[in-house]
Amino acid sequence: METKQFKAESKRLLDLMIHSIYTQKEIFLRELISNASDAIDKIYYRALTDEALNFNKEDYYIKIIPDKEKRILRIIDTGIGMTKEELEENLGVIAKSGSLAFKSAHELKDGYDIIGQFGVGFYSSFMVAETVTVISKSIDSESGYKWESTGVDGYTIEPWDKDTVGTEIVLRIKEDTEDENYSEYLEEYRLRNIIKKYSDFIRYPIKMDIHNKRLKENSEDDYEDYVEEQTINSMVPIWRKNKNELTKEDYDNFYMEKRYGFDKPVKHIHISADGAVRYNAILFIPERTPFDYYTKEYEKGLELYSNGVLIMNKCSDLLPDYFSFVKGMVDSEDLSLNISREMLQHDRQLKLIGKNIKNKIKNELMSLLKEDRTQYEAFFEAFGRQLKYGIYSEFGSNKDVLQDLLLFYSSKEKKLVTLDEYISRMSEEQKYIYYATGESKERIEKLPQTELVSEKGFEILYLTEDIDEFAIKVLMSYKDKEFKSVSSSDLGIEDSETEKNTETEELENKELFEKMTALLSDKVTAVRISKRLKSHPVCLANEGEISIEMEKILSAMPNNENIKANKILEINGNHQVFEVLKDAYKNDSEKFGLFTELLYNQALLIEGLPINDPVEFSNSICKLMI
């Protein structure tokens, strides 16, 4: 037996790897299984050029054997094995990757790839084991060797009888502590869960002897224990299968198996890319919003695999926030991993994959919009708000990606329409895309501000969600047509005769409007004759970037109480109320003041805004009734 020291800065570096690099102890099994898979891959590559070596895939597997009584966990593979020199080179030098060296020396063909990159995964076993023993026999050696270490300073190596080629790793599992339950790594159910989670798509069978119960023969209630060897992993991932061989049911089953949601997906996207970066992906657009979707607790991201091995549960960098509802996975052989294989280095490949995925999602949603409008509207009901947030955020930089996906209720069509559909129906005389805001389409339909636009025969988009107008403000225009609120001070559709009559009316009643403006000086910026009202007596219009609807939303937020829209009180000069108002101005200043307050409060109520003093409002009505 030889005793040797680690060649790298042993204790300090090993301690760093055990305690700092890996964030989850269960990762050790993933790393050891990946190493075992690498070892079998190496035989496969040798067989490509060595005619004397026959690669029969059925002869190659990985076996996991827990022994609770002895606190031993064995990981056995039928791979290429290691010579004494390779044991010292690969296990005696921390951060030395045998897989990487093999990969550099051989041209990889036939869709296979070696998983290992850094050679540190093996040492993750010291997170759960007090002693690690490696017994290996190389395909190039007549004898086997045993390598053993406690992970403290060095290791021992000695010849060992081993009949078959391959490697057996023996972990003596640590005793439990108050903080750590190491015994769980000897439980069948726990080991199965870890394998399914991280290594389900390793291309070779991962086998375990599973203990179970069954009815004894010729018995109805007497059970017996039995042990059955089972293959735990799926081996062939769905994303590597030919799309033409898969059915919608196959994708739906995968969606349910991965627990992406309890609904059925609206759409699946299967990507196989071989360009600047190679990757496979299966993405799903859910039917319903998760219960926590619009909360801080919700985490976006796709499962990320490196050559079939799960390395991240939720890689947020692969999805923009506005597509955070998308579920699924990405598998690539080209990713640059960091030393622990748990995290990605933010490299060009990841950005390319993310950009490609974004474009694929956009294209699929556009296809759904055109080919299955009912299904798209159901999707939009669930996630349309997120698309609008995507336009509003980041100063509108994403509007070109998202604007064609938006739907709004149309006053003319009485259904949801796209901006492009709205534009296609515009007459030559219509300059703007008109919209109205409110809590519901029923309330918007009753708004006085819609009268003139509707009379002109122009279509109005109804904005009923809090985010709607903020998104529209960021969009500013669509295909060179500006958006215009029906509450805007200038609608751009008043004819010259109306303009002339309004100017005349305002000049004749200049002092009246000045008096009303003075009485409401802390509430409105001006009072004037309305160009838009037809049957209603009064309404509010606004000037500036903050609309009345935006004021309602912003003022409800913390520290935003003082954000106000620049309101204009508009009076219908053709309404009987205006005649009463003029009479009061001439003959009864007290009544004129009451009328002014009442008309303003009436306009507030129409907009769904609160009255400042409901008691005073009620008293004013009573005074006028007496």
Swiss-Prot record:
Pfam family name, one: HSP90
PROSITE patterns xref list: HSP90
Residue ranges, annotated region (B): 342-552
Keyword Chaperone: yes
Protein localization: Cytoplasm
Region (C): 553-626
Alphabetically ordered keywords of this record: ATP-binding, Chaperone, Cytoplasm, Nucleotide-binding, Stress response
Example of a GO cellular component annotation carried by this entry: cytoplasm
Region feature (A): 1-341
Keyword Chaperone: yes
GO molecular function annotation: ATP binding; ATP hydrolysis activity; ATP-dependent protein folding chaperone; unfolded protein binding
Primary localization: cytoplasm
Matches recorded under SUPFAM superfamilies: ATPase domain of HSP90 chaperone/DNA topoisomerase II/histidine kinase, HSP90 C-terminal domain, Ribosomal protein S5 domain 2-like
Family: Belongs to the heat shock protein 90 family.
Assembly: Homodimer.
Function (record text): Molecular chaperone. Has ATPase activity.
UniProt name for this protein: Chaperone protein HtpG
Gene this protein is translated from: htpG
